[in-house]
């Protein structure tokens, strides 16, 4: 039988999934991307503001990177996270990079030092 906490997380995820395709609110052992905003800059690049949630416990287990991934699975860019964010959850960091005009959507995924990949990802349109 599922406990109340798990049922609550399932209900929370279901409600959020129905309301928005650009956010997620599940926090687990893996690092979850919970929000992504992409804006075109004046020089034609894209600033990607990404919010990550992870239960960082210190240097032994923390969210250490997030990636911007093309539809073919290739990594367009990565934002390295140089330290744990134990007291700042969720946290937002930015990356500015060029995205080819033929790429209309990207997936943003987070990585942690123990589980690597596997948390919630977000697919977002590129505003060319």
Predicted regions located by residue number:
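N-terminal signal peptide c-region/cleavage motif recognized by signal peptidases
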Residues: 20-25
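Short, solvent-exposed, Trp/other aromatic-anchored flexible loops in extracytoplasmic proteins
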Residues: 78-116
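Beta-strand signatures of extracellular beta-sandwich domains
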Residues: 65-69
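Bacterial N-terminal signal peptides that target proteins for export
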Residues: 2-14
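Edge beta-strands of extracellular beta-sandwich domains
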Residues: 117-126
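Short, surface-exposed binding/anchoring microloops in extracellular/periplasmic proteins
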Residues: 29-63
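Hydrophobic residues positioned within well-ordered beta-strands of beta-sheet architectures
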Residues: 34, 48, 64, 93-95, ...
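Ser/Thr-rich low-complexity repeats and stalk/linker segments
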Residues: 70-78
